[in-house]
């Protein structure tokens, strides 16, 4: 059956355009995620900061791209593609990955949202690693139930070869189960005994965090120029992932010291007679931690 009015224009008729589009976009660009190490970062809170931290630490040793809510970058270049959505539509995602691959980058960090998975924007991305920061109820207007929201986010660990999970978060079990069923390697972080990247000490001198970690068997000390104790967990996730991707533990820890921060994420603006902090705490747990 032909579509009326198209004349001689070639077209392909598919049952679901949303499902077909990411695969067509990936094919158009030569399946770029297969030429990169793609790390996805998801979670209710902390995914933007963790994505920035990871791109910074990886970028100290390797050319790395970053696509997030707050910025889209390749190496030190701002690409100016940021928009309203955490995860853009599939053609933009694939074009970004293709640009990373063409530039000689080895890694791309994608902030990966539940909407991005449920609306198939990320269907044709081959993930090497999936990082989950935490999970609490959000976007129930879209997903309908908390279980459906968690299941959408768990798509990341079902498709990644390695899952990096927050052992201290109450929602860990669902992601660990999904990763296990998919045969993914599970690496944990947090303060709980027995984790792979354990926060042994978190100190909060003015304007910074000082961290001592057992980082996949190696003890390291790191200084992060950010406020907010919860950012220690974001840093632990980034460090663990960077080490898994071949960055030496001491080099990864040292890279945190030069982290420039994230626009609108515990961003400190020193003024007189008071200090201004700009943050995006949009859920009850995030607001409680920020305050």
Where in this protein do the model-derived segments appear?
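Short, basic phosphate-binding NTP loop
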Residues: 1-40, 49-61, 194-198, 205, ...
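Buried hydrophobic packing segments
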Residues: 21, 54, 58, 235-245, ...
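Short beta-strand-centered segment that lines the nucleotide-binding/catalytic pocket of NTP-utilizing
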Residues: 61-75, 112
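P-loop NTPase switch/communication element
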Residues: 70-92
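AMP-binding/adenylate-forming catalytic core of the ANL superfamily
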Residues: 282-291
């Amino acid at each position: 059956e032909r579509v009326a009015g198209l004349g001689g224009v070639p077209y392909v008729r598919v049952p679901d355009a949303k499902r077909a589009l990411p695969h067509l976009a990936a094919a158009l660009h030569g399946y770029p995620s297969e030429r990169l190490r793609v790390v996805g970062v998801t979670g209710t809170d902390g995914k933007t900061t963790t994505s920035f931290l990871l791109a910074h630490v990886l970028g100290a040793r390797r050319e790395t791209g970053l696509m997030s809510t707050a910025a889209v970058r390749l190496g030190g270049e701002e690409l100016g593609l940021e928009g309203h959505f955490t995860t853009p539509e599939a053609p933009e995602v694939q074009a970004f990955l293709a640009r990373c691959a063409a530039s000689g980058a080895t890694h791309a960090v994608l902030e990966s949202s539940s909407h991005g998975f449920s609306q198939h924007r990320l269907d044709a991305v081959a993930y090497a690693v999936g990082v989950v920061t935490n999970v609490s109820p959000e976007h129930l207007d879209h997903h309908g139930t908390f279980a459906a929201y968690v299941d959408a986010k768990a798509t990341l660990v079902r498709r990644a070869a390695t899952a990096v999970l927050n052992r201290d978060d109450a929602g860990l079990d669902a992601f660990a189960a999904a990763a296990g069923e998919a045969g993914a390697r599970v690496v944990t972080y947090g303060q709980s005994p027995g984790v792979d990247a354990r926060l042994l000490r978190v100190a909060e001198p003015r304007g910074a965090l000082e961290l001592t970690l057992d980082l996949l068997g190696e003890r390291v000390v790191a200084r992060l120029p950010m406020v907010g104790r919860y950012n220690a967990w974001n840093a632990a996730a980034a460090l663990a992932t960077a080490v898994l991707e071949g960055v030496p533990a001491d080099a990864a820890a040292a890279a945190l010291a030069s982290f420039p921060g994230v626009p609108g994420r515990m961003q400190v603006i020193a003024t007189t007679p008071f200090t201004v902090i700009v943050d995006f705490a949009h859920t009850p747990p995030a607001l409680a931690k920020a305050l």
